[in-house]
Amino acid sequence: MASLLMLLTSVAMTAQESNWTLMPKAGMTVSTLAGEDAEYCSNAIGWTAGVDLGRRLSERVELTVGVGFTKNVVKDDIGTSIVSIRVFDEGRMTFEYIDVPIGVNVKLWQGLSASLDVQPSLMTAGKERFFYDEYACDSFEDRVKFMSNPYSDPRTSEYTHFLKRDSEDGGGIRHMSNKLNVSASIGLSYEYRRVTLGARYHFGLTNVMDTDKLPMYSHYPDQSEYDGRHKDKLRYLSLTLGYRIGL
């Protein structure tokens, strides 16, 4: 009995003194693109989830490596484009990645820590959706009259009326994107009773798009020529809630 008690005490002390931790976490992202197309893009909300393995080196310093999934959404402000009886005014690009963040956490004060990470990410999916207002004509004759004028605007034409708000898949984003994206991040976190609230800002180091696969077309509000050389990088803020488990 005494031997069993000593064994249990030894295991408990080892667990308490372990320098290894595991932290599952999940939260939201606020993303945009930085680069030549930044003026046409704005923030949109996505989500992220994953788990970090930590190894404490000292009282203040901890090395971490993790694996996670991030869905970044970017709003594409395409301006107003009239196609027949549809008025396109917004697009949303979605980039989904499996992330492997590698970094260091430094304890600043009590539960407050700062972090610095490098994160390679493998793209798993990508898509683009365009949103539009659709209008309709009451009769075939009205449609002929509306279509006879190439400058007709369905929002003001006497031959049309508003029908619905809808969207369609733009396609091609995954094919035109780099499969590997590398970013760096800086952040702050606060831990209380193993519950950790974290905020990180991620700076893309590589281009989101593969410039060799971009088409030659113009679809921006100023109708500037799209030369296929745009070099945009992903920038996003992640806010997560995690729980630290001692190993």
What are the language-model segments listed below?
Residues 20-26, 63-65, 100, 114-120, ...:
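Transmembrane beta-strands of outer-membrane beta-barrel proteins
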